[in-house]
């Protein structure tokens, strides 16, 4: 895993990152309690791998780590503004962490910190935290993990635990469980969306070993073999096209080869379908029309819809995504 520490935070972003770090330290040191679904639980009760909370507090041994993931990290490195942060937690669900965050912001401990005084000085009219929304896991709407959402200091934050996914048979919806940063990074769509900002070390983490390279060289690449990434969720095929057209990036040759592969060994398509043919079928049969349509709409309403159409044509997906126009 490679890392860099040259990201430039705004003052407000610095407040958010310091706050997330402080909450993790506070939970480890104090073992606070919160009410979850009508029952009171301590941090140790809820935290996966909480045996470390039996030990005296040490900043290097916090059990719950917080990382900002995905689009915000990518956009910061590209010098683009972003006010939506996805926070990944190592050992609490998103909703549990959000409840502890709210409890910390309302505690005497926080009110006495330097951070609280700086926030009061520079952001006097911003509420510390808004209402916490809980979005339950809902496979019907492609929400595979429970997520919490709230507004903190003017930023929209989504909280979810690091995850790994196991897909079974023809079902697109995976079985989910807690994972490592590597598990989580490798399950994402493309490498430039798989970067993390570790709020405890103030550094970018590149667990795929390709994200920073691909960001600097303008490459759309999947963390895993393209066939594996696309089989897990075929909609990622269209996302690759969209991000390529949005940023002017080149689609990696492995993706092009995967999507344009023909039937092997001279066999007929019916008896020996190629990977590309299987992926086209999966995109049509495993992805809802709603998700499909949203992705196509984002392509065509983006900054370079012509490039998106060129890319779709290059991988023979135009008729699949725009049948009415093509006919």
Residue ranges and their predicted role:
Residues 1-322, 327:
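Catalytic cores of the polymerase beta-like nucleotidyltransferase superfamily
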């Amino acid at each position: 895993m490679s890392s860099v520490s040259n990201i430039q935070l705004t003052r407000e972003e610095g407040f958010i990152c310091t706050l997330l770090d402080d909450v993790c330290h506070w939970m480890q040191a104090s073992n606070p309690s919160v009410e979850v679904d009508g029952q009171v639980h301590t941090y140790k009760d809820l935290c996966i791998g909480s045996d470390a909370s039996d030990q005296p507090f040490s900043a290097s041994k916090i059990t719950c780590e917080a990382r900002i993931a995905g689009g915000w990290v990518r956009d910061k490195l590209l010098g683009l503004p972003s006010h939506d942060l996805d926070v990944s937690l190592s050992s609490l669900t998103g909703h549990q962490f959000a409840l502890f965050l709210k409890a910390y912001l309302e505690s005497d401990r926080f009110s006495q910190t330097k951070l609280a005084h700086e926030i009061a000085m520079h952001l006097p009219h911003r509420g510390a935290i808004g209402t916490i929304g809980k979005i339950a896991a809902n496979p019907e709407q492609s929400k595979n993990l429970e997520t919490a959402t709230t507004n903190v200091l003017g930023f929209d934050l989504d909280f979810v635990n690091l995850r790994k996914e196991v897909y079974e048979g023809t079902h697109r919806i995976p079985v989910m469980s807690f994972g490592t940063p590597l598990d989580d990074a490798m399950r994402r769509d493309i490498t430039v969306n798989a970067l993390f900002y570790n709020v405890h070390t103030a550094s970018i983490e590149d667990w795929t070993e390709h994200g920073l390279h691909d960001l600097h060289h303008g490459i759309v690449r999947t963390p895993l073999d393209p066939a594996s990434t696309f089989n897990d969720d075929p909609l990622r095929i269209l996302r690759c096209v969209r991000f390529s057209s949005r940023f002017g990036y080149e689609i990696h040759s492995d993706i092009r080869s995967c999507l344009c592969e023909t039937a092997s060994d001279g066999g007929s398509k019916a008896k020996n379908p190629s990977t590309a043919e299987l992926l086209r079928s999966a995109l049509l049969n495993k992805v809802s029309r709603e998700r499909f349509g949203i992705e196509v709409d984002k392509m065509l309403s983006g900054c370079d819809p012509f490039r998106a159409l060129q890319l779709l044509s290059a991988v023979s997906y135009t008729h699949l995504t725009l049948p009415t126009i093509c006919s």
